[in-house]
Curated annotation (Swiss-Prot):
Gene designation: rpmF
GO CC annotation terms, alphabetical: large ribosomal subunit
Family, as annotated: Belongs to the bacterial ribosomal protein bL32 family.
Biased composition (Basic residues): 1-16
Biased composition regions of type Polar residues, renumbered to the chain: 21-33
Species assigned in the record: Aliivibrio fischeri (strain ATCC 700601 / ES114) (Vibrio fischeri)
Name the UniProt record assigns to this protein: Large ribosomal subunit protein bL32
Length: 56
């Protein structure tokens, strides 16, 4: 089992954890259907940037 040579300070622990923050996902509204969707993704009904790209 790995054992550290010396105790890590609160500062070093905080610096390591500085990249662990969660961000909210970017959501946008489709111009045609008005449906909310993730950015750079097709909506549930098949629209992307105002155009129908998936026919069901």
């Amino acid at each position: 089992m790995a054992v550290q040579k010396s105790k890590k300070s609160r500062s070093m622990r905080g610096m390591r954890r500085s990249h662990d923050a969660l961000t909210t996902s970017a959501v946008s509204v489709d111009a045609t259907s008005g449906e909310t969707h993730l950015r750079h993704n097709v909506t549930a009904d098949g629209y992307y940037r105002g155009r129908k790209v998936i026919n069901k």
